Amino acid sequence: MKRSKKIISPLASFNYHLENYNGLIKSFRKNKDISHIGSMLNDCYTSELTSKIFVEDYDALVLTDKSQKIVWVNDGFNDMTGYTKKFAIGKKPSFLQGEKTSEKVKKQLREELAFNHTFSGSILNYRKNGELYLCKINILPIYNLDEKLKYFIAIEKDETKMNQSF
C-alpha cells in the first residue's frame, strides 16, 4: 500500500491575496475621497490635486477654509484620531495639538500657512483617547480660477509605528 504525501500550501498565497485586497480597498477609498473633494472644491479642483492625492500614501485628509477651519475630513481622520467628522468640522486642526507638540514646529507651520506656502513636516498630535501619535503632514494651498486662496488640504500619515522615539 502506497502512502500519499500531504501537500501543504504555504500561506504566501493568502498573504498575496490579502495584500491585493488591501490595495483594492485603499484605491476605493482614494476614489471616494477624490470624488468628495472634487464636489466641494468646484472651481478650485485640478488634475494635479487628483494625482497628488491618488499617489500619496495617507491615512487622513483634512480640508480647511482659508482661515484654517476644518470644512471636511475623510473617514481615515476618525480612524487616525478618534474624532468624528461632526466634531472636527468648524474647528482648527490645532485642537489635535497638546503639551508635547513642538513649539518650533507649530511656529514653522503657522508661518508657512500665513504666507500661503506649502508645509511638509511631522508633528506630535494627540488622539481623542489622549494617546500621542506622530503625524507626517503635507499641506497644500488650493486656489480658485482667479488665483485667490480658498482652501488648504492636509495629507496626513500616522508615523507612530515607524518612530517610537517620542
Residue ranges and their predicted role:
Residues M1-D59, L63-D65, L149-F166:
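PAS-family sensory modules
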Residues N42, E99-E111, N163-S165:
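PAS/Per-ARNT-Sim sensory domains
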Residues D57, E112-S122, C135:
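PAS/PAS-like sensory domains
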Residues I70-V71:
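Conserved hydrophobic beta-strand signature of PAS-family and PAS-like sensory domains
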Residues I89-K100:
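PAS-family sensory/regulatory domains
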Residues L124-G130, I137-L140, Y143-N144, I155:
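PAS-family sensory domains
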